[in-house]
Swiss-Prot record:
One of its GO terms (cellular component) is cytosol. Keywords: Chaperone, Cytoplasm, Stress response. GO terms for molecular function: adenyl-nucleotide exchange factor activity; protein homodimerization activity; protein-folding chaperone binding; unfolded protein binding. InterPro entries: GrpE, GrpE_coiled_coil, GrpE_head. Belongs to the GrpE family. PANTHER family: GRPE PROTEIN (PTHR21237), GRPE PROTEIN HOMOLOG, MITOCHONDRIAL (PTHR21237:SF23). Residues 1-32 are annotated as: Disordered. One of its GO terms (biological process) is protein folding. Gene3D superfamilies: 3.90.20.20, Head domain of nucleotide exchange factor GrpE. This is Protein GrpE. It comes from Haemophilus ducreyi (strain 35000HP / ATCC 700724). Participates actively in the response to hyperosmotic and heat shock by preventing the aggregation of stress-denatured proteins, in association with DnaK and GrpE. It is the nucleotide exchange factor for DnaK and may function as a thermosensor. Unfolded proteins bind initially to DnaJ; upon interaction with the DnaJ-bound protein, DnaK hydrolyzes its bound ATP, resulting in the formation of a stable complex. GrpE releases ADP from DnaK; ATP binding to DnaK triggers the release of the substrate protein, thus completing the reaction cycle.
Length: 198
């Protein structure tokens, strides 16, 4: 009994060899597109990840810039608040002191009409010195009086009680100051109560 291998002719061997080569070539061709497709997919994924990283970097830079700007704004507002606190810390205290100045001025007006002898004049001189020293001390801390007869009426600084005709005073100028106003570092803490020339 002979086997097929023994009876195979050289032509059969060659055909079998060619079939093997075709199978290997087909497998290689099948594998090559598969590898190329996989490689193309990897490149696409790499490009997608690079794009994502670039966008994430931009977002991070934007967040960082916004955070720095916010920090600068907070720092600036804090400095302004501290400056205002220092500048206007005396406001409430100063408002209370203004009544003392008003009373000293009223006392001086009353004493001017009542001076009859040297003892009374000494009292007037003492009150005047106290008043001047008190006003000088207020000025050292930025508290200034506003509202003099003849000044131009300014609604931001003056509170008009009424308007009346006045001799020797132009219209819209102060004809009478009923109560002096005061500013603290340029900010009005009490407007002057005035009469305005019509």
């Amino acid at each position: 009994m002979t086997t097929e291998k023994e009876t195979a002719t050289p032509a059969d061997v060659e055909v079998a060899s060619q079939e093997e080569q075709i199978d290997q070539t087909t497998e290689a061709q099948v594998e090559e597109p598969s590898i190329e497709a996989e490689l193309a997919g990897c490149y696409a994924k790499i490009h997608e990840l690079e794009t994502y990283i670039a966008e994430a970097d931009k977002r991070e830079q934007d967040i960082q810039l916004r955070a720095q700007a916010e920090i600068q704004n907070i720092r600036r507002r804090t400095e302004q608040d501290i400056e205002k606190a220092h500048k206007f810390a005396l406001e409430k205290f100063a408002k209370e002191l203004l009544t003392v100045v008003d009373n000293l001025e009223r006392g001086l007006v009353a004493l001017d009409t009542a001076v009859t002898d040297e003892k009374t004049q000494a009292l007037v001189d003492g009150v005047e010195m106290t008043h001047k020293e008190f006003v000088s001390t207020l000025a050292k801390f930025g508290i200034e009086a506003i509202g003099e007869i003849g000044d131009v009426f300014n609604p931001e600084l003056h509170q008009a009680i009424s308007m009346q005709p006045a001799e020797n005073i132009e219209a819209n100028h102060l004809s009478q100051v009923l109560q002096k106003g005061y500013t603290l570092q340029g900010r009005v803490i009490r407007p002057a109560m005035v009469m305005v020339a019509a």
